[in-house]
């Protein structure tokens, strides 16, 4: 879409906000259009979500729900981005690469579970982690050789603490892998991971746009990073695609995103946190994902060390199911927590 400015004096399509809006609606339309077709195809092929044997009893009714819906919204995101974003911008190219790599990892994992009708039959934990490490390394290596800012910032503080240089690659890999797995753990109830992901993308988009603008970044004491604002187009496309997906994923879900969706969303959130220099603030932006991950760590650690469980079941959303909360109540309350956390994160823009 940006190329249209080369053939006319009308600069309408040169504005990031305009192209982000087009990307949003294109991805939304593609997601809404192709998702029901995919659902019908997946039902015919019996590409259903295998249910964990220890999951709450209410989940057994979901055993016939198709999965791998992430393929559609990632496809919609990439198509909209290719049409609307500046493909000469290396932040955009690496962002698309990140989505493709992690969607592929998730797809392999999903297919293994579906073909064997076993929730444990996908990639082994070791193989999944190795695949995520390789994919993360590819992304951060390209970022580094392209000269990305390697300074380290803390939330609510206007100056960089230090320049980590090449050692920042280790932190960036950790951020992407952790974020990817955190969203994956959260994706256990209808729409639970989708809406907090949208909130996180919107918050990060604000940081991307402001840091990419010389005037705003200087006024707000944000890192000034040329070209970063172009990622808002890619982020807006994913928001639109996720909203289209949510139409079919809200309770009771007609389709699940699968690992192909959750792993790629999480990795992309981690990527946006890295390039916008919000590696630490990402803990607040993705607070619900962090909460879910911590609950699993506490549960596993406590059981291995003390042979006792902290929660009735982990991740923590299953704990609330076990104590009698209905699914919709858990989902909406977690959405509220995610919204509040992102509001606080956005306040940090001014409080520096």
From Swiss-Prot:
The record lists the membrane-crossing segments as 10-30, 67-87, 88-108, 129-149, 159-179, 191-211, 227-247, 255-275, 280-300, 329-349
Recorded name of the encoding gene: mraY
- One cellular component term from this protein's GO annotations in UniProt: plasma membrane
Where does this polypeptide localize? Cell inner membrane
Keywords of the record: Cell cycle, Cell division, Cell inner membrane, Cell membrane, Cell shape, Cell wall biogenesis/degradation, Magnesium, Membrane, Metal-binding, Peptidoglycan synthesis, Transferase, Transmembrane, Transmembrane helix
Q: Which reaction does it catalyse?
A: UDP-N-acetyl-alpha-D-muramoyl-L-alanyl-gamma-D-glutamyl-meso-2,6-diaminopimeloyl-D-alanyl-D-alanine + di-trans,octa-cis-undecaprenyl phosphate = di-trans,octa-cis-undecaprenyl diphospho-N-acetyl-alpha-D-muramoyl-L-alanyl-D-glutamyl-meso-2,6-diaminopimeloyl-D-alanyl-D-alanine + UMP
Q: Which cofactor does it need?
A: Mg(2+)
UniProt main location, coarse: membrane
Q: What is this protein called?
A: Phospho-N-acetylmuramoyl-pentapeptide-transferase
Show the NCBIfam families listed in the entry.
mraY
Record-listed E.C. numbers: 2.7.8.13
